[in-house]
Regions:
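Conserved short loop/turn motifs at secondary-structure junctions
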Residues: 65-66, 163-172, 214-217, 427-432, ...
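Glycine-rich beta-strand-to-loop/alpha-helix junction loops that act as flexible
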Residues: 71, 166-167, 195-197, 246-247, ...
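Short beta-strand-loop/turn "lid" adjacent to the catalytic site in phosphate-handling enzymes
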Residues: 18, 31-34, 61-101, 163-176, ...
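Conserved phosphate-binding/catalytic loops in two-lobed NTP-binding clefts
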Residues: 186-210, 477-493
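Conserved phosphate-binding loops in N-terminal lobes of ATP-dependent enzymes
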Residues: 10-13, 17-21, 29-45, 49-51, ...
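Glycine-rich phosphate-binding loop of actin/hexokinase-like ATP-binding domains
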Residues: 20, 25, 30-40, 87-93, ...
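C-terminal, non-catalytic interaction/recognition modules in large multi-subunit enzymes and RNPs
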Residues: 3-5, 13, 145-149, 153, ...
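N-terminal glycine/serine-rich phosphate-binding loop of ATP-dependent small-molecule kinases
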Residues: 1-87, 133, 140-163, 176-181, ...
Length: 703
């Protein structure tokens, strides 16, 4: 083995499985691994997976030059309310702003509407005497006595973390910084987050909610990242350790510990990146990314080879399909919709006698009934096993055997008998309900973005995604379904395709026809300098750093903005024309027309500073499988249920590793690989393209 050999590892921790991908940078060889997540200590599964993967690949820890990690740990802590006991220091009179929220209701006609409770209870939200004007002028100096008293009260109340969010601190952070110093003096060792660092932009409610969420998960994420870094060091891995951000870039652990709120949805973001890379490689201008794992399902629209981006999202929605029903998090993110629908989603019969699936999940412990680890409640995986879609002896490539009788017993006792159905009917009901739930979520996502999903091929991945993709695609009426090679660990591939990157934002309201170009240039210069410093500390050479500028703009009097590109270089009055044209083009794409004679104003200015995009292909042969067979003959047949066939039928089972470009066959068919299984229903036409992508297209009978 050459001493110059180097490799990279991508690690994606999900609620049920932890996926790893190892890539040899010298030969391009790839190894994929899937391991049960260890909920009590997620780093255990990472450690086990890295050791096993390196052993299988014949590699060594000393060769690993980088590990890129995505996790849903911060997301789960927010949803399950398992973060730190958090206190809030805010401007006098604004103690309840984080609970009042917006005047708008996400459901106008529901008088019993539920809104998510703030992360900080009222008795831990304390006021300090100070006031800043909207332009950054100090109206009332910070009263140190009131500040000391408030910090002391939080200490006595057992606060484990403190959020500081003062009115208009995005324009002048001097009071927040003074409070931060007082916290270090009076509450040493207690983590502190200031809004001027976490989200230095206008909008009080979103800024406060985000700052509270950041410090709420900070102790948990710091402990986790410290522990994982230590374990990787003990394994002898000398390379860099990076964390995926929700925006699709990666950052160092030091940055991630300071702003852990940017890790929320980092795992799903990696899957969207992989789908975007695949769209470019396949020449598909549009894709609907569909990632179904063990706990959740995610849908993301890919346009022109890029995922849609948003500057805000919600967590812990009271109503999963309604905007405004969750906690607002104001950080850059890849825009997607996520619901509790995965292989481990629990099926039950409610008090009305209706079948419900999810959002609760069996996770990895105890897992579905068929895992034989103590689970008694039927899950989607149990239903898929009963229907014949999964091979009990080939789950995870044969490393884990599934108990068919346990699955059948759970479905029969918990669903079939209460509903007066046969076991098969109950299993199909579970399968169909979860498909309808996921399709409905994807449809909502498309409608919110003004997209007609009938024009978007479905790109399916995740451990459970290919099992359900054909039926979900039929519900959505997509033109075709694409399943990549190595679909079960595609999010881990996406981690290896992410550049080092970070976003910066500043608020400064400017009417374009009377803009202070010197101030705007100063803001961009300040953010670009800060961004270059962050990337240089992470080891990125100055010559390969790229910078993207944008501004959030609107017509005067409007309440929300449209983000548009801003040219590089020094801006002046001559820049007004190109910037205005960019805004009008973007506005017209969203609203079909532009108002005449209304001045345009910019509210927020943003900079994204990025390193080079790593080279990796997410399609084509992976070097992680037995040599391809020439024959297209199925490796076996088994009984699988399809309602179109009115029952169980002998269904050919193909070895995914034996399929070659140009192969095609009709459905029904089952295609197996180690980390996932693809199910093609009756009427499907399956073919393999030159990158080994499995493509399912409906015949007329299947439309």
């Amino acid at each position: 083995m050459s001493p110059a050999r180097s490799s990279r590892v991508g690690v994606d921790i999900g609620g049920t499985f932890t996926d790893l991908v190892w890539v040899d940078d010298t030969t391009g060889a790839v190894k994929v691994g899937k391991f049960l997540t260890t909920p009590k200590d997620p780093s255990q599964a990472v450690e086990q997976g890295v050791v096993t993967l390196l052993s299988d690949a014949g590699g060594s820890a000393a060769e690993v030059r980088s590990i890129i990690h995505g996790t849903t740990l911060a997301t789960n802590a927010l949803i399950e309310r398992k973060g730190a006991r958090t206190g809030l220091l805010t401007t006098a009179g604004f103690r309840d702003a984080v609970e009042i929220g917006h005047e708008g209701r996400y459901d106008m006609y529901d008088i019993f509407i539920d809104s998510p409770a703030p992360l900080v209870p009222r008795h831990l939200r304390l006021e300090v005497t100070e006031r800043m004007a909207a332009d950054g002028r100090v109206l009332t100096p910070l009263d140190e006595a009131s500040a000391r008293a408030a910090i002391g009260t939080l200490r006595e109340a057992g606060a484990e973390a403190i959020a500081i969010c003062l009115l208009h601190a995005y324009r002048n952070p001097v009071h927040e910084r003074a409070l931060e110093k007082l916290c270090a003096e009076l509450a040493p060792g207690v983590p502190v987050s200031t809004s001027s660092e976490v989200v230095p932009e206008i909008r009080e409610y979103e800024r406060t909610s985000t700052t509270c969420a950041n410090v709420y998960v900070m102790p948990l994420m710091s402990r986790y990242l410290d522990d994982l870094e230590r374990k990787l060091h003990e394994l002898g891995i000398p390379g860099n350790f990076y964390i995926m951000l929700s925006s699709g870039g990666v950052a160092t652990p030091a940055t991630a510990k300071r702003v852990p709120i940017r890790l929320v949805e980092s795992g799903p973001a990696a899957g969207a990146l992989a789908a975007a890379r695949m769209a470019r490689e396949l020449g598909e201008p549009k894709l609907l990314s569909f990632d179904m794992g063990g706990t959740t399902a995610k849908a993301c629209v890919i346009d022109k080879g890029e995922p849609l981006l948003a500057r805000e999202f919600e967590v812990a929605r009271a109503d999963r399909f309604k905007k405004g029903s969750g906690l607002p998090i104001r950080v850059p993110c890849i825009e997607m919709i996520e619901i509790g629908a995965g292989g481990g989603s629990l099926a039950r019969v409610d008090r009305m006698g209706l079948l419900k699936v999810g959002p609760e999940s069996a996770g990895a412990d105890p897992g579905p009934a068929c895992y034989a680890l103590g689970g008694q409640v039927p899950t989607v995986t149990d239903a898929d096993l009963v229907l014949g879609y999964l091979d009990p002896g080939f789950f995870l490539g044969g490393r884990m055997r599934l108990d068919v009788e346990a699955a059948r017993r759970a479905v029969e006792e918990k669903v079939a008998r209460p509903m007066g159905l046969t076991t098969t009917e109950a299993a199909w009901g579970i399968h169909r309900v979860v498909n309808e739930n996921m399709a409905a979520a994807a449809r909502v996502h498309g409608i919110e973005r003004g997209k007609d999903l009938r024009a978007y091929p479905l790109f399916a991945f995740g451990g459970a995604g290919p099992v359900h993709a054909w039926q979900v695609g039929r519900i959505l009426k997509v033109p075709r379904v694409l399943v990549p090679f190595g679909a079960g660990a595609m999010s881990a591939y996406g981690l290896l395709a992410a550049p080092l990157a970070f976003d910066f934002v500043r608020t400064a309201t400017q009417r374009l026809d009377a803009a202070d170009w010197a101030q705007i240039n100063g803001l961009f210069g300040e953010m670009e300098k800060e961004g270059r410093a962050v990337l240089r500390r992470a080891g990125v050479e100055a010559a390969v750093i790229t910078i993207r500028r944008t501004a959030e703009m609107r017509y005067t009097g409007q309440g929300h903005e449209v983000e548009v590109e801003v040219p590089a270089g020094t801006l002046s009055a001559a820049s007004l024309g190109p910037i205005t044209a960019n805004f009008e083009t973007a506005y017209r794409a969203l609203y079909s027309r532009t108002p005449m004679g209304v001045p345009i104003e910019a509210l927020n200015f943003r900079v994204v500073v990025s390193g080079p995009v790593p080279e990796i292909s997410v399609s084509g042969p992976k070097g992680d499988a037995p040599g391809p067979r020439v024959s297209l003959a199925p490796k076996s047949t088994r009984q699988a249920y399809f309602p179109e066939a009115r029952g169980y039928v002998d269904t050919p089972v193909y070895d995914r590793y034996g399929l070659q470009p140009g192969h095609s066959f009709p459905g029904p068919a089952i295609i197996e690989e180690r980390e996932s299984t693809t199910v093609a229903g009756p009427g499907a036409r399956v073919r393999i393209d030159d990158r080994l992508t499995l493509i399912m297209e409906p015949g007329e009978a299947a439309r």
